[in-house]
Amino acid sequence: SLDGVSIASRRFYEIYHQYNMKGIEFIPFERSEGYYACKFVNIMKFDVERSKSIRIEYQGKVSYGVLDNGKCAICQRSFGHHHPFPYRMTVEDEGKLKQNTFYRSDIEFEERNYQSPILWATDGIIQAFTKEKCRIFYKNVEGYFGEGDCGK
């Protein structure tokens, strides 16, 4: 969602339990049966230092480690900053990973009109969802909000 809450469908919930996945507590919505807010219980540290070594080019600008998403042309509100792929956790946390488990980053990133943590899935999860012919990761789609990027 736009405020960083991850929402799961009943299908996701069923596959998660069928394959004995770990790392998420599901909180059912009272008025939307079959949908759940996800509370990620395993929090890993995003490795800010390692991300600084990644050279990136974005819209003609060269940067290391952090992308400035720019500002609204009308109100000058910042669209935030984000770190480029690959999104890495610290080496210490990488050594603690368990199979079939979800993790989230300790910090959240803002881009345009939403903010959220980075979500990681370990071995077994992608394979399970592929086997069940179910997509779990979707590209974020930005819409047209009027004259300025913020809708003003």
Regions found by a protein language model. Give the residues of each.
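Extended, low-hydrophobicity, polar/charged segments
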Residues: 1-152
